[in-house]
């Protein structure tokens, strides 16, 4: 006996039809995909509305804003961190960038100005 039985033929026909319907269902209509509206941050919404008409001067303002934002976030703030670290964190090696200022006592002379520190006032009515 060669060929398919009537039950096998029916089963194959139904599978082919099911495959055809499945493939047809995979085709998107012109209205698909339906995406939800994109949520924008307030600043992003401002720039989107600002640049909508495409004026040249508005594009220049936006480019200046972007470059200044880059300069602040990638140059200025890291430089502040480096400056803070160098200024306020003493290294373990001697003769580093930062050194503690010497103590000043009454009668000492300040080298830069030549000023003499006056003696401390005495408060006889108070007990220290």
Curated annotation (Swiss-Prot):
Keywords: Acetylation, Electron transport, Membrane, Mitochondrion, Mitochondrion inner membrane, Respiratory chain, Transmembrane, Transmembrane helix, Transport. Its main location: mitochondrion. The modification N6-acetyllysine is found at residue 24. The modification N-acetylserine is found at residue 2. One of its GO terms (cellular component) is nucleoplasm. Disulfide bonds: none annotated. It is found in: Mitochondrion inner membrane. InterPro entries: NADH_DH_b-subcmplx_su6. Accessory subunit of the mitochondrial membrane respiratory chain NADH dehydrogenase (Complex I), that is believed not to be involved in catalysis. Complex I functions in the transfer of electrons from NADH to the respiratory chain. The immediate electron acceptor for the enzyme is believed to be ubiquinone. This is NADH dehydrogenase [ubiquinone] 1 beta subcomplex subunit 6.
